[in-house]
Swiss-Prot record:
One of its GO terms (cellular component) is polyphosphate kinase complex. The gene is ppk. It comes from Helicobacter pylori (strain J99 / ATCC 700824) (Campylobacter pylori J99). The lineage of its organism: Bacteria, Pseudomonadati, Campylobacterota, Epsilonproteobacteria, Campylobacterales. GO terms for biological process: polyphosphate biosynthetic process. The active site is at residue 431. Keywords: ATP-binding, Kinase, Magnesium, Metal-binding, Nucleotide-binding, Phosphoprotein, Repeat, Transferase. This is Polyphosphate kinase.
Length: 675
């Protein structure tokens, strides 16, 4: 018997749970639409990175197998098979929601169903807003098929010259920055691509439009950097980002159009692909013909529309922790260590702490890591302001996938302001979230530390669940300062910390040691691990051994889980759960009954434990330990948003009509009570 679930199929099962939220009839309609948008965006990234990586392995005949022993070719086939039915489910769900929205006055209307007045408005919109932005190409001997960037959305048309009667083909690129949903009347929307299609004869004068289809390509978007050759890492990353859009096509999505037109499109795509693709004749590319609009990720436009608030869940306003009501946050932290649970407790104190430090004349230095900060960052702006007055040292991780460009921008801005900027660490990704502020008062140095499971990004802090920790303890600050020094001197793999634990050297051995300790207590042992993913085979094997010793193990794994639970003789004492709700579960909390409870930036994956700089923080303060344990206990009682994984790899939603509990709703209400 194989002891592990396949990683890729486990991720797809997570995205299925996202799709299930779109099917939840208890949710407002735009909330359901939101989950369809998330589903599609997730799948885009899965193809850009995971499927693209498998294709590279397959095409280069690299004998690399998944944790379950499946070859790249086998995994690609399993992915295609898994999605074949689910893509149809997604289309049906969209059509159901679309019909329900129509009854509520929000209409996504096909162009051919518009009346004459609405078509006139669409024509005006085309002339004033779209005509100058679309890029039409007539494909002939002097105009070959142009390269397509990742996530290109375009129309492919069969056209005929009215005078010569000669037929040819045309490509019309639609820019990504245009509004997809065009509001012609209050609540009535037409799709931009359908408006363009209806006016193709204005782009190709004296031509008849014989056939047309919308299509979208997804390309390999991973960035391969040879760090050994990097003299200027920022410059190398900048050049690599420019190449991201030139990757091989891994997925083609089409809508409408004849089979003959699709064949011609495939032949045209083949004409500019690399030798590898010509050799394989595009057989590795996954092709999906859609009965609905392409790219449901654009549904965010409707979800965020200001006129339809009644069709969404009420916005929750994160609450300020009562201990932070004082004007001087540093005094608050000096009194006691504090733990916040975002988004239920506001992220504002984190921003305020940096802003207060920047304006405080007693502040000597700020040291901080930045992983994903977003395009509009009040935190970076505060650091830029501080850099003109005090010592500011920032490690900006340029390898944060899909945030590389934003991070590079902020790194350059910080450098211009006078901050010391370090662009990551050689062959490691710095994923630890840490901040230490040093002040001088009464002729003494005082250190204030902030550590978190989540990013320094106020926007994601409103939709991700994370814990963040504030302390004025010297032993914690000393460890963080030591870690910063090791990052600056590229000795992160050789240093060890005294109070905290860091990857790649300390976290994995520590977790194994903690599992072994619970094994010594046999049936009295108890482990709860909450993480985003569980993939590391060594950790899984130790959990199997602990189960066989009688240790009870509850795993709350949001996404990928390669461990097989409830297998007799292997893992019958292990239960695996997943919570999918309005907030993305992102905190990592690790509880060991006979030792301690920890929180961490690290998931239980080889990349986190072996190839990243991460932190594992013990909760030595009893109040904080109890708060972390309370989070786990409530989530293990969830009967509305919690799924359980069985030994066959299937997830079933847990339901108890007599005791309904949505853990995320519970924490919202609990935050209100603390005021």
């Amino acid at each position: 018997m194989n002891r592990f679930f396949n990683r890729e199929l486990s991720w797809l099962a997570f995205n299925t749970r996202v799709l299930n939220e779109a099917k939840d009839e208890s949710l407002p309609l735009l909330e359901r639409l939101k989950f369809l948008a998330i589903y599609d965006t997730n799948l885009d990234e899965f193809y850009m990175i995971r499927v693209a990586g498998l294709k590279q392995l397959y095409e280069h005949k690299i004998a690399s197998k998944g944790i379950d022993g499946a070859s790249p070719e086998e995994q690609l086939e399993k992915i295609k098979h898994y999605l074949a039915h689910e893509i149809e489910e997604r289309e049906l769900e969209f059509q159901k929601i679309q019909a329900l929205l129509f009854k509520k006055g929000l209409c996504i209307t096909p162009y051919n169903e518009l009346n004459l007045e609405q078509k006139a408005k669409a024509k005006t919109y085309f002339k004033e807003q779209l005509y100058a932005l679309v890029l039409p190409f007539k494909l002939d001997s002097s105009h070959t098929f142009p390269p397509l960037a990742n996530l290109t959305f375009a129309l492919f048309a069969h056209i005929k010259d009215k005078e010569t009667q000669s037929a040819s083909y045309a490509l019309i690129k639609l820019p990504s920055f245009i509004f997809r949903f065009v509001e012609l009347e209050k609540g009535l929307f037409a799709l931009a691509e359908e408006i363009v299609e209806a006016h193709l004869e204005e782009l190709f004068l004296e031509h008849e439009i014989l056939d047309c289809m919308a299509f979208r390509v997804t390309c390999d978007a991973d960035i391969a950097i040879t760090e050994d050759e990097a003299h200027d890492y920022a410059d190398l990353m900048s050049k690599s980002l420019r190449k991201r859009n030139q990757g091989e096509i891994v997925r083609l999505q089409t809508q409408k159009g004849s089979q003959e037109l699709l064949k011609t499109l495939l032949a045209s795509l083949r004409s500019f692909q690399t030798h590898s693709y010509k050799k394989h004749k595009l057989t590795g590319m996954h092709i999906y013909k859609s009965a609905i609009m392409l790219n449901l990720g654009d549904l965010w436009e409707l979800v965020n529309h200001s006129d339809f608030k009644a069709l969404k869940s009420p916005n929750f306003t994160p609450k300020i922790h009562p201990h932070f009501n004082e004007n001087d946050l540093f005094k608050s932290i000096e009194k006691q260590d504090l733990l916040l649970f975002h988004p239920y407790e506001s992220f504002e104190p984190v921003i305020d702490l940096i802003e207060q430090a920047a304006s405080d004349p007693t502040t000597l230095s700020i040291k901080m890591t930045l992983y994903r900060v977003g395009k509009h960052s009040p935190i970076v702006k505060a650091l830029i302001e501080a850099a003109s007055k005090i010592q500011v040292s920032v490690l900006v991780e340029l390898k944060a996938r899909f945030d590389e460009e934003s991070n590079l921008h902020w790194a350059k801005a910080l450098e211009r302001a006078g901050a010391l900027v370090v662009y990551g660490v050689f062959k490691l990704k710095v994923h630890a979230k840490m901040l230490v502020i040093t002040k001088k008062t009464d002729n003494q140095l005082r250190h204030f530390t902030h550590l978190s499971t989540g990013n320094y990004n106020p926007l994601s802090a409103k939709i991700y669940t994370d814990v963040s920790f504030f302390s004025a303890k010297n032993e914690i600050a000393n460890d963080i300062i030591k870690l910063f020094h090791s990052l600056l001197t590229s000795s992160a793999t050789s240093n060890t910390l005294e109070t905290l634990f860091m990857a790649p050297k300390q976290i994995k051995p520590k977790i194994i040691e903690l599992i072994q300790n619970e094994m010594n207590h046999k049936q009295e042992g108890y482990i709860i691990l909450k993480a985003n993913a569980l993939v590391d085979s060594e950790i899984i094997e130790w959990l199997y051994q602990a189960s066989q010793k009688g240790v009870k193990i509850d795993l709350i794994i949001r996404g990928i889980c390669c461990l097989k639970p409830q297998v007799k003789g292997l893992s019958e004492n292990i239960r695996v759960y997943s919570i999918v709700g309005k907030y993305l579960e992102h905190a990592r909390i690790y509880y060991f009954k006979h030792e301690n409870i920890y929180f961490s930036s690290a998931d239980l994956m080889p990349r986190n434990l072996e190839r990243r700089v991460e932190l594992l923080i013990p909760a030595t303060n009893p109040k904080i330990a109890n708060k972390l344990l309370h989070i786990l206990e409530i989530q293990l009682k969830d009967t509305l948003k919690r799924y359980e994984l069985n030994s066959k790899g299937r997830y079933a939603k847990i339901s108890n009509p007599n005791d309904p509990l949505n853990s995320q709703d519970y924490f919202e209400k609990q935050a209100l009570k603390t005021l």
